Amino acid sequence: MSEQLSEHISVQTAQMAQVLVKIVNDKYQWIEERKAKQPLASFHPLLTRSERDFYQALSGDNTVFILECKKASPSKGLIREEFDLDYIASVYGEYASAISVLTDEKYFQGRFEFLPQVRAQVAQPVLCKDFMVDPYQVYLARHYQADAILLMLSVLNDDQYRELAAVAHDLGMGVLTEVSNEQELKRAVDLQAKVIGINNRNLRDLTTDLNRTKQLAPLIPQGTIIISESGIYTHQQVRDLAEFANGFLIGSSLMAQSNLELAVRKIVLGEHKVCGLTHPDDAVKAYQAGSVFGGLIFVEKSKRFVDVEQARLTMSGAPLQYVGVFQNHPAAQVADIATKLGLFAVQLHGEEDSAYVSELRASLPESIEIWKAYGVSDALPELLPEHIDRHLLDAKVGEQSGGTGRSFDWRLLPKHSDLMLAGGLSAENVAQAAQLGCRGLDFNSGVESAPGKKDANQLQQVFQQLRNY
């Protein structure tokens, strides 16, 4: 069997062939053992067709996401120690078009029993992700309620593929056909694959290159659903690739994060902040709309000023990552407030210079980030070089930076920057702002009914537009 397999592994993956051969040979051994323990005849008569349409779920105007439940992998080892499938499924169910579940035991610490556990929690189709080489596995996947399977052309010849795909389709299951190079892509097209997954991972050295999606996607006929797989870590990468792919399969980058809810938001919606929160209800509105960060303003002259106790009360409303906004405060005071409240970051909105930032960095716990805001009128300012985790650009009107409700000339921005953008953002201009390639957007007066009063409808409108891509 390994000789037959070796013939069909693409030339580009020859150096990795022995690893794939080992994985697949181990899979054949697993299949024989499983057939003995759970013969096909014991469950085949009970099989029903899937009623969750994988192909339909991946259709539509917006970018789709197949989010993956993955405990471990050969390249990364153990990825998620606390593998709470109920929690994972409850988060994914809010954002995914389909959910992928690793079922390979030896290399990914998966199990077929994971499939029904996830499926019971969600309404979306569930994809069984495994090294499929035998029709028995397809039947087994359906027995455990999978609605779709992965077929990898790096380990299947055309006849094997046709056989497995036919079994899947007879059971009402969809097929995600994975390719990793142009040769496999040509085969997928000839095999009339409805959904083609482009694996950005190089099977020779396990590195990832997102340009593979850009190179291969234009070769795929119109009407085929294109999914970009592997190496997706940021919303900016998603936006960059969205014109080449209909959707993304994302697993490892999410599974590695302890706060899965915010990790998914960051990739699907972006790393956005709602600033000027003054009440726990407003924190709830921001969180429910899709925000990652919540801003608390400790500048007394601001209409949205909060003291430490009001900030603590506001923070109790929702589990956002909270950012304290300060302006020319003594560094020791900033560090004290940030530490007391357990802030995610402090944002400096005054004339704080490098010496101040160095002093503050030495006073803050390492886990608390430092963000620096700059006012922009007609030119981009020089950014502080050290100890700044994020730079934020806001409109400067006269001597006032920030809180003006105005935008600066966005044509000044570099394409695909690591900057946060603030100033006059609202439902009217958010779609345009989202295309600028910034790391995140910072909303305040544009989502309010009155200063310091966030408007749930305006927030929902803004975040719905952020999802329209």
From Swiss-Prot:
Pathway: Amino-acid biosynthesis; L-tryptophan biosynthesis; L-tryptophan from chorismate: step 3/5; Amino-acid biosynthesis; L-tryptophan biosynthesis; L-tryptophan from chorismate: step 4/5. SUPFAM superfamilies: Ribulose-phoshate binding barrel (SSF51366). Residues 1-271 are annotated as: Indole-3-glycerol phosphate synthase. InterPro entries: Aldolase_TIM, Indole-3-glycerol_P_synth, Indole-3-glycerol_P_synth_dom, Indole-3-GlycerolPSynthase_CS, PRAI_dom, RibuloseP-bd_barrel. It comes from the Bacteria. GO terms for biological process: L-tryptophan biosynthetic process. Its EC number is 4.1.1.48, 5.3.1.24. The keyword Isomerase applies. In the N-terminal section; belongs to the TrpC family. In the C-terminal section; belongs to the TrpF family. Monomer. This is Tryptophan biosynthesis protein TrpCF. The gene is trpCF.
